[in-house]
């Protein structure tokens, strides 16, 4: 089977390895020395759901090139721009063609808001480089924020980072969280897993679904929805539904038409699950 590819890009201590371990379920992970650069690491793994099976190559890259060197925000941005100039060159054309997703990691404690905002401009350029004149790129881009172990970041900073990310048309995931939020959306580590599992990969081996079981599951869900609508339940909070729609509309403002359609379908499914 032909493998799929995703790229995880970030500066040192921004969570690249934690994200890759989460995606690979900590399987097939190479031994990495503490002070060794993460650039060029490739994790060859596989992923199976009840619907499909895929082979997946997780490509990790890092900037700056010297891991132990103390650098300013300006120097990091220059290194990121240098990385992008190489990535968009003809030499890396084959890599761009096979990518199904890009994860850009930031350290919510160490990276300033000014740095993150300018870095997101480069990520926008990366997104543009992944398409061509004939067709749009069908992959996903996610900005994942975290802190080094033992450190915390205040809620206001997290909200400001999320606002910056959404303004640039990307999804933000706070790796320090998990479970579901007040809108019944998966967040943090659970959202990373959901993002990977729900993506329509280029190369998939679809698994056969038992028609009887599929019909049974569908009817069970219809019956559950009917009961929820008929019963007067406190959990049936329309304000939450309207809030979810409002947030979704705001997030979708800067997306492309194709991204909006995909995002809208996801929101519709979540609302159906909620009611």
From Swiss-Prot:
Q: Which domain of life is it from?
A: Eukaryota
* Gene3D superfamilies assigned to the protein according to its UniProt record, in alphabetical order: 3.40.50.11960
Which example biological process does GO assign this protein? Answer: vesicle-mediated transport
GO molecular function per UniProt: protein-macromolecule adaptor activity
In terms of InterPro entries, this protein maps to: Irc6 (IPR034627)
Provide the leader sequence positions: none
Q: Which Pfam families match?
A: Adaptin_binding
Give UniProt keywords alphabetically. Chromosomal rearrangement
As for what it does, the entry says: Involved in gross chromosomal rearrangements (GCRs) and telomere healing.
Protein family according to the UniProt entry: Belongs to the IRC6 family.
What name does UniProt use for this protein? Increased recombination centers protein 6
Q: Which gene encodes it?
A: IRC6
């Amino acid at each position: 089977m032909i493998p799929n590819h995703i790229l995880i890009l970030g500066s040192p201590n921004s969570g690249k390895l934690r994200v890759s371990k989460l995606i690979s379920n900590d399987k097939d992970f190479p031994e990495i020395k503490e002070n060794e650069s993460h650039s060029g690491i490739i994790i060859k793994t596989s992923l199976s759901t009840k619907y499909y099976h895929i082979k997946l190559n997780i490509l990790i890259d890092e900037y700056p090139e010297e891991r132990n060197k103390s650098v300013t925000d300006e120097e990091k941005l220059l290194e990121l721009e240098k990385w992008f100039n190489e990535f968009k060159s003809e030499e890396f054309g084959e890599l761009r063609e096979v990518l199904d997703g890009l994860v850009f990691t930031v350290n919510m404690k160490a990276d300033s808001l000014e740095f993150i905002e300018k870095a997101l401009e480069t990520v926008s350029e990366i997104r543009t480089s992944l398409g061509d004149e004939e067709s749009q790129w069908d992959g996903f881009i996610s900005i994942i924020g975290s802190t080094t172990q033992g450190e915390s970041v205040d809620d206001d900073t997290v909200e400001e980072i999320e606002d910056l990310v959404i303004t640039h048309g990307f999804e933000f995931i706070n790796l320090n969280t998990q479970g579901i939020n007040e809108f019944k959306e998966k967040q943090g580590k659970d959202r990373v897993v959901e993002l990977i599992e729900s993506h329509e990969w280029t190369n998939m081996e679809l698994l056969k679904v038992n028609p009887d079981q599929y019909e049974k599951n569908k009817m069970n869900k219809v019956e559950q929805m009917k009961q929820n609508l008929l019963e007067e339940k406190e959990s049936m909070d329309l304000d939450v539904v309207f809030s979810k729609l409002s947030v979704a509309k705001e997030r979708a403002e800067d997306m492309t038409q194709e991204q909006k359609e995909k995002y809208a379908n996801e929101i519709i499914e979540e609302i159906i699950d909620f009611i």
